[in-house]
Amino acid sequence: MIGGSYVVAFVFLLTTLDRTQAFAAKPQPIDPSGWPGTFPAKDHCSKCGLCETTFVSHVTDACAFLNDGMARNIDGLEAKVHGRRRNQDLVWSGDSQPNNGVAEEGRFGVMTRPMQLAKGKNVDGAQWTGVVTGIAVSMLESGMVDAVVCIANNDDGNTDNWSSPQPILARSVDQVLRGRRVKPALAPSLAVLDELKDSTDIKKLLFCGVGCAVQAFRAIQHELQLDEVFVLGTNCADNSPTPAAAKQFLSQSFKDKLDGKRVRGYEFMQDFKVHVKYDDGTEQSQPSYERLPYFSLQGDVAEFAIAKSCLACFDYTNSLADVVVGYMGAPLDSSSMDSSFQTITVRNKMGERMVNCAIESDRLQVGQDASGSGSHEKFATVTLSSDNIVQKMVGGEMKSEGMPRLLGELMATLMTAAGPKGVNFARYSIDYHILRNYLHVLDIWGENDANNMIPAYSLEIVKKYLDTDEAFKALAEKIKSKR
């Protein structure tokens, strides 16, 4: 009996050790309360949610902001996802091509058809017309997917919660509808990965997200053992690091004009103004808008209102999504987001199926090809040179106050009349953000690391401006001389 007790005790000890070792070997999610300091990318972490799951073990191969992240992800996965790499040819204002007002793959990514204008249909309560929501609802209703990963607005009617992003694994239309409207702060889309992997009833999935989250998702999607995966992306630039920062941006920029109002979202629009959509908080209230010219914003708003990860991003156009929805390439033909066109980019056969499903379900209207006019390059470099973020990098003059409102309105009117429009406005926005972000990564990590982390298409744009624009070249040289 004594010998038997020893055997039992020994077996128990071995079993306990095995469990302890197994627990120790299992990747441990990072506590989100320590963000960003305890996360691998530190200040440049985009809070995509990957590290908040057991998939954290894949972070060095998936994160868009570690090592050569965006170059590794976009250049390395584009052909795998879409069947081919993009045509790298870029369109410039001086080119003689007759189609220089049509979106090219060099900037906008792989396309199976030209970028088109689109509106959502039969989607109430959207920030725009419901293009993204309409596609997602159609796919779920038709049985094309079993679930949708999206970011819900943690909105209980309280005006303080309007910008709080909450990732959900939506299995019903009502749950998908919680994802309506843009969330202006970093959102951990991938935080539901463990729930997804444990859900044996989900075999076909739609993942909705911005570029950095889509990149990380594409890097690990093979681990999920799903039969079909669809990815619906949005264009994205300059998110706030937290909901509090987004609210601070509005309160500081618009003073008391939004007091007591329920904000439904805001966008930096093609008329060089920030448009804030709001209502009075009642169930039947209709949306109204408050607008402020970019030029009248206080100079220090970028310091707290733009996440550091967004300053190191080169995936404005969401290169690895099957379908991408945005608005910068659309004409500003309405004073209301509720009736304005957006753009839709279809990248592959999966994307064609997604769009066709939404059209057949009468939740999507696709119109003519997106087009544009006007020169964009000089607008990009002039914007860059006057940017407080850039001036801080080069030790230049920092503006603390924006223009007086009337002068700002005049400037916005002139810029809208004289500046690039449609697709060419999108080119302006893409180039400006790529150039600014190149200067940022050059300043933080140096020339060699910067060149290694920037995807090929962005590097081509940077090289073009370095070769042709003396002002941009001078900014880059000033930053290089600091090291």
Feature-to-residue mapping (PLM):
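Entry/capping segment at the start of metal-dependent catalytic domains
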Residues: 62-132
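A short alpha->loop->secondary-structure connector
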Residues: 222-234
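Iron-sulfur cluster-binding cysteine motifs and their immediate structural context
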Residues: 27-44, 49-89, 323
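Short, conserved secondary-structure transition motifs
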Residues: 236-248
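N-terminal chloroplast transit peptides
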Residues: 1, 9-12, 22-24
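Low-complexity, highly charged intrinsically disordered N-terminal segments
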Residues: 125-163, 167
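Long, compositionally biased charged/polar accessory segments in the mid-to-C-terminal portions
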Residues: 145, 254-483
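Gly/Ser/Thr-rich loops at beta-strand to alpha-helix junctions
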Residues: 126-131, 155, 207-217, 238-240
